[in-house]
Amino acid sequence: MDGLHPASWMLLLGSLAFWSASSLLLFSLALPGARASNQLLSECHNGKGKGINCSELTVRESEVRVCDESSCKYGGVCKEEGDVLKCICQFQCQTNYAPVCGSNGDTYQNECFLRRSACKQQKDITVVARGPCFSDIASGSGEGEYEGSGGEVHKKHSKCGVCKFGAECDEDAGDVGCVCNIDCSGHNFNPVCATDGSSYSNPCLVREASCLRQEQIDVKHIRSCIETDETSIMGKKDEGLQNRPEVKDSTDQREGDFMGNYIPCSENYNGYCVHGKCELSYSSQKASCRCDSGYTGQYCDKTDFNILYVVPSRQKLTHVLIAAIIGAVQIAIIVAIVMCITRKCPKNNRGRRQKQNLGHFSSDTSSRMV
């Protein structure tokens, strides 16, 4: 190094200065481009990049994308796994059935399931109504979480205006109006107290009254509002029958479409009724329980202790009859054995006495003959 010529030193220092200046120049030129690229990427990601070719940024997005507020919204948690970003939706939703209608037209089991679906889809979904979304034809949707979708949300608009709470517009009749095709004749006696302060014989009559009055009436609690006031239950039922609009004849051409007012619930409602059968109203798309004998409650989960006797089903009745016949035969056999034993004992005693008398008689006669 000491032997280098001064000219060589000058050449070496000049080269180092040139490379340093070139590096600084390239860095200063690249910095505004990087800032502009990040700004364009942010605008494209937030949907504000109008007029910008965002397709060219798809490759670079994976290189610079990080977890921020826009990466995972609606209650999700953003997590980086290597070069991949994942949005984790940790919602511990309870399984209670409190249906809500979402802004996307889907019915969710409860509000928690709606928020979880919004997180998974990264879409803004809000509650538009409490209760299921009413639709003419239900169809499956997204995640299958007790959902059903339809084009109309919660109300049906027609020539009648707005038919709510399960009512249908009868446009074929001369007097166009809302008709309630709700048949509660097949429901067991399961008294409930409604939010209007009246008692009804079963929840079906509550839905019928809500449909007839076109106002919101729900089940407040199980059993009548005043347990001893049985007349209020029957009076409410008679009142509903008197004010009930005329229902079209069962030979209506729409009978094939309805196939009855109630249809069996889908597999999504498994376990909804504890001791009973789940039925879905075709018009209102609301689930209800037809409780087995001896059970009551909205979900047939309470034992009805007021019932004096329980009428068994056809299969159980057959078993009861067979058991009764077998028991009767056993009782008859036992009675016959007892009667046979009690009758043999006196005969044996009389036989022994006759033999003793004959013995005495023979000895007396023999002595007399001698």
Curated annotation (Swiss-Prot):
Belongs to the tomoregulin family. One of its GO terms (cellular component) is plasma membrane. Residues 356-370 have a biased composition (Polar residues). Keywords: Cell membrane, Developmental protein, Disulfide bond, EGF-like domain, Glycoprotein, Membrane, Repeat, Signal, Transmembrane, Transmembrane helix. Residues 349-370 are annotated as: Disordered. Residues 37-320 are extracellular. It comes from Xenopus laevis (African clawed frog). This is Tomoregulin-1. The gene is tmeff1. The chain crosses the membrane at residues 321-341. Glycans are attached at residue 53. Disulfide bonds join 89-119, 93-112, 101-133, 180-211, 184-204, 193-225, 265-278, 273-289, 291-300.
